[in-house]
Amino acid sequence: TVGGNIAENSGGKKAVLWGTAVDNIASYRMVTADGNWMEVERLEHTCSKISPEADIRWRITVKDGRTADPEKARVLSTRELVTPGSIYRRKGLGKDVTNKFLGGLPAVQKEGTDGIITSARWILHKMPPLTYTVCLEFFGAATLAGKAILEISNLLGNGYKGCMLAG
């Protein structure tokens, strides 16, 4: 589900290009454990993966859950959350699955413990005009793998025969 994607901060095979759920969320709505509506909106979205150097701004609005329609519900509170981009990834490792708090960002990577996500808006990306994915795996000495990766990167990094390098 869309809510499960956010709750797990999922990425899939295109995460190398565009990141995981947190990178591509425009906004989402959820019902909290106390029965209120919570709307979370990413402000000033760059339409790209979150950079470790960036500060990411979120607007969090809590609305009265006694009103069934969240659009008509009374606003109980609004706050802005600023999180450093570095909390979303570990240097050299990609997504940091050990950091469940994520600076206080509700629901993302919490596996459903903050509430039930009911809807979301996403940043969509146009697929590149490529039809094949190649995944490389190396065994043996890391120095040999490093040399091979550098050679491949130099070849593909220049758009060799329509190839696109990601990773």
Segments the model singles out, each with a brief description of its role:
Residues 1-152:
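FAD-binding subdomain of flavoenzyme oxidoreductases
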Residues 146-165:
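Acidic-enriched catalytic cores of C-N bond-cleaving enzymes acting on peptides and small amides
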Residues 134-137, 162-167:
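C-terminal cap/substrate-recognition region of VAO/PCMH-type FAD-linked oxidoreductases
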